[in-house]
Design a protein with these regions (language model features):
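Ser/Thr/Asn(+Pro)-rich, low-complexity disordered segments
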Residues: 27-462
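N-terminal export signals
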Residues: 5-23
Length: 462
């Protein structure tokens, strides 16, 4: 494993953070380190991107020449798009190279089979064909439209359209049929259990049925789909108030919430919160970092809602830090769904700040992308945590970035890098190094006119 260059590059930043070097020198050292991390992370995304322009799900970095996986998803493709825009914005590639990469991906997306205006959940990253059998096992793959995965592809396409006016008309045509009301069940006060005013998880096209669940928890990554639909007018603004800050107090959940019933924009809702280590917050579903903090990489929730979302994001990060360093005593923190270091995929989180009774537990597995998501809210602590992971476990692959996860109890480091997680790393670094770089499409138009007023009225009661 190629570790030496990273550790040498990180030494100056680490010393600056730890020893209080003069401010200007510390800033230069830290920025150089973050730019190095971005550059290498972008190289990993390039390595995952196939000849037709689709970013595959993952790469195994144990070989000298990492090979992309067969499968990809709409989320992975979106990650490739916004990472390319970020690379140009940070000077890693020039504008011409950005255009070539975006154009290749947009052309591939134009050819992908769709249904009801949305993209299927699994494609062959090398051919663009819808997957009907899972690579390696041959298990059947049902054709499925995922609301949240489509949201991340649409986000990537909007970022690409904003960055490259030449591609904008083609992307607008692609998005013309993406009507989020397809996933929405309008609210019915006479039967809110069957008609909750929320988004379905998805739709099976082989038998024309929706999933049996809705995305009810507000502080989770599917709220990106909600914001997109409200912004483009395909979802009513009151849909936002029909999502849960916590479950209703009489429902079984991780802890009994405190709060009160309030009426906002004509919607009667439970304004609830949890308390963790003396800290009031609105929980996510499982207590993971990406549920809470992937969306604000793009939608400026903290600045549009400083007393609600802004406070909650910081408290979510602080809770993760204290869970890892104090409650469990791991010496490291950052818990979010990731590759299992020994193989496979699992959800990790801080159980106490998630609504689900089962929750996501930390199990001693930290994932670097969680620290990057925290970086806009706790920069120095996130950088120090990442440097410790690189130093103590060899978690950094020179030229490609951080491996996906580390079991800090055993020292086992994942052999893989995942497109989703590297895409979050790239977006987080873009936000830290060039604030707002990927947020332009989500600060204007319907986002400014319809989403921002909702967030301004948000009051979590914390």
């Amino acid at each position: 494993m190629k570790r030496r260059t990273l550790l040498a590059a990180g030494a100056g930043a680490s010393a600056a953070l730890a020893l209080g070097s003069p401010a200007a020198a510390a800033a230069r050292d830290t920025e150089a380190l973050l730019r190095r991390w971005f550059r290498d992370t972008y190289r990993s995304i390039e390595a995952m991107t196939t000849g037709i322009g689709l970013t595959a799900d993952k790469i195994d970095v144990t070989s000298a020449d990492p090979v992309p996986s067969v499968n990809t998803s709409p989320t992975n493709i979106g990650c490739g798009l916004w990472s390319t825009v970020a690379a140009a914005g940070l000077g890693v590639i020039d504008t011409r190279t950005m255009h070539r990469g975006l154009a290749r991906t947009v052309a591939a997306v134009e050819r992908l089979e769709r249904a009801h205006g949305f993209w299927f959940n699994w494609y062959d990253a090398h051919t663009g064909a819808v997957l009907t059998e899972w690579p390696g096992t041959g298990d059947p793959v049902r054709p499925f439209l995922s609301s949240v995965d489509n949201a991340w592809l649409v986000a990537g396409l909007l970022i690409a359209a904003d960055a490259d006016p030449v591609l904008r008309p083609r992307i607008e045509r692609l998005l013309a049929d993406a009507d989020w009301s397809f996933f929405h069940t309008p609210y019915d006060a006479d039967d809110p259990a069957a008609n909750p005013g929320q988004l379905r998880g998805g739709f099976w096209t082989d038998d024309d049925t929706y999933t049996g669940h809705w995305y009810g928890a507000l502080n989770t990554e599917p709220r990106m789909a909600s914001y997109l639909g409200i912004a483009d007018g395909s979802l009513p603004p009151e849909h936002y108030w029909h999502t849960f800050r916590t479950m209703l107090p009489e429902w079984e959940q991780e802890q009994r919430p405190e709060g009160e019933y309030v009426t906002v924009d004509g919607v009667r809702m439970w304004r609830g919160h949890y308390t963790y280590r003396g800290r009031r917050l609105v929980p996510s579903w499982g207590g993971s970092m990406f549920e809470a903090l992937m969306v604000p990489l793009f939608v400026p929730e903290a600045s549009w809602s400083p007393k609600a979302w802004g406070v909650n994001h910081r408290r979510h990060v602080r809770s993760q830090i204290e869970h890892g360093l104090v409650e469990e005593g791991y010496g490291y923190w950052g818990f979010s769904p990731a590759n299992i270091p020994d193989g496979g995929y699992s959800e990790y989180g801080v159980d106490a700040i998630g609504m689900s009774v089962e929750g996501y537990t930390s199990k001693g597995v930290v994932t670097p992308h969680a620290s990057f998501l925290a970086m806009p809210f706790a920069r120095d602590e996130a950088i120090a945590n990442l440097l410790r992971m690189a130093r103590d476990f060899g978690a950094y692959e020179d030229g490609l970035g951080f491996r996906d996860s580390v079991d800090v109890r055993t020292g086992r480091v994942s052999d893989f890098m995942l497109a989703l997680d590297q895409g979050m790393v790239a977006a987080a670094l873009a936000q830290v190094l060039s604030p707002g770089l990927l947020q332009r499409p989500f600060r204007t138009g319907g986002f400014a006119a319809r989403v921002r007023p909702l967030l301004a009225r948000e009051d979590f009661g914390i």
